[in-house]
Amino acid sequence: MFKSVAKLGKSPIFYLNSQRLIHIKTLTTPNENALKFLSTDGEMLQTRGSKSIVIKNTDENLINHSKLAQQIFLQCPGVESLMIGDDFLTINKDRMVHWNSIKPEIIDLLTKQLAYGEDVISKEFHAVQEEEGEGGYKINMPKFELTEEDEEVSELIEELIDTRIRPAILEDGGDIDYRGWDPKTGTVYLRLQGACTSCSSSEVTLKYGIESMLKHYVDEVKEVIQIMDPEQEIALKEFDKLEKKLESSKNTSHEK
């Protein structure tokens, strides 16, 4: 569920260049393996309102078009993906890696990025991203035709997501991408990103937060489904296996 609880990192880092002092803070997210990094002065990484950029450590071609991503993946082993928002950076790490081993380096790289004001991605990034697809994977999305009336419903859904739902998710270091609405089944298709990826509470957020709100305001909405790529599906299955294994071990120890 949306927590939107911000906790300051214990060791903020300052970076001074010839013009200004940059102060970076870290905020916790509902996902213990994701942290949100941002400037206390509101320094921007992208134009406000821009669509968040997600880069995984396996996206070699995309990494080559982002100096910040190159440096983070090279100098911070264990970082699985990063999401660049308009004024924040969300880092997802491997659950076996401790934040203390990578957080200072990430903060240092981000402070330098903001201090020098360089573009976070190259001009060719979006063209490469479109050519690559979503992480090199083909995501199965049903195709459906919309009448003029259906288009109005779809626009209403998108407006609700952008104005009522997306701000809360961005605050927690994630993002949401509206992929469409099937008028025949009433199904809304969404893609969660950033801190929402591989988060144990993402399904709760989806069903009891997003789905409930959309159903309340739009009668035509019957269900909300999250679109995932193969890597996300595998990660969630492995997480479920681990939870069951831990629960089984706990029960066994109690029996003894």
Swiss-Prot record:
GO biological process, one term: iron-sulfur cluster assembly
An example molecular function term from Gene Ontology annotations: 4 iron, 4 sulfur cluster binding
GO cellular component assignments: mitochondrial matrix; mitochondrion
InterPro entries the UniProt entry points to: FSCA_dom_sf, Nfu/NifU_N, Nfu/NifU_N_sf, NFU1-like, NIF_FeS_clus_asmbl_NifU_C
Knockout mutant characteristics: Cells are impaired in growth on synthetic complete medium with acetate as a carbon source due to defects in mitochondrial [4Fe-4S] cluster formation.
Entry keyword annotation includes Chaperone: no
Keywords: Mitochondrion, Transit peptide
Primary location: mitochondrion
Localization in the cell: Mitochondrion matrix
Locus of motif CxxC motif: 196-199
Keyword Mitochondrion assigned: yes
Described purpose of this protein according to its UniProt entry: Involved in iron homeostasis within the mitochondrion where it is involved in the assembly of iron-sulfur proteins. Together with BOL3, required during the last step of iron-sulfur protein assembly when the iron-sulfur cluster is inserted into the target protein. Required for protecting iron sulfur clusters from oxidative damage.
Description of how the protein assembles with itself and partners: Homodimer; in absence of BOL3, probably bridged by an iron-sulfure cluster. Interacts with BOL3. Interacts with apo-target proteins, such as ACO1, LYS4, ACO2 and SDH2.
Family under the similarity heading: Belongs to the NifU family.
Domain free text: The CxxC motif may bind a [4Fe-4S] cluster.
More info: Present with 11300 molecules/cell in log phase SD medium.
Protein name: NifU-like protein, mitochondrial
Native organism: Saccharomyces cerevisiae (strain ATCC 204508 / S288c)
